[in-house]
Amino acid sequence: MSADASFHSIIDYTVDGPDTQQEFVAAFAEIQERWVRFYPGYQSARFYLSTDGTRVYTIVRWASEADYRNFVETSDTEGRMAAISQALAGLSGRAEARMTGIPTYTVAREVGPGPQRLDV
């Protein structure tokens, strides 16, 4: 596979059930639309729901770390954080962040489809 220079922010929340998962995704998708997606280098935000109804992972993909850093330096962080707080307060259930530190990552390796290796 070719090298992937993209940069990711992986946001992890614990929630109290499937209804809260759905509310969380709706609220945080709106935050992406209003506060993030128009920045240069933004590629996508994908929301993953655990099948047991207890977790939501959001993976925000940027074209590069430089694009992400530009977003951090030039965006309205205070306004975005207020919108996040308001979104969390508006949920009918409970959602708690599980990240520690800055939740940013680069791709180290990816294994894609191909023939089975038999040289074990």
PLM features per residue range, with description:
Residues 1-4, 118-120:
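Basic/polar N-terminal segments that are highly enriched at the extreme N-terminus
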Residues 6-14:
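Active-site-flanking beta-strand signature of metal-NTP-handling nucleotidyl enzymes
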Residues 14-26:
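Short, surface-exposed ligand-recognition loops at beta-strand->loop->(often short) alpha-helix junctions
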Residues 30-43, 61-100, 119:
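An amphipathic, aromatic/His-enriched active-site/gating alpha helix that lines ligand/cofactor pockets
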Residues 48-50:
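Short beta-strand micro-motifs enriched in acidic
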Residues 53-55:
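A generic structural signal for beta-strand entry/edge sites
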Residues 100-120:
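Acidic/histidine-enriched, glycine/proline-rich intrinsically disordered or flexible terminal extensions
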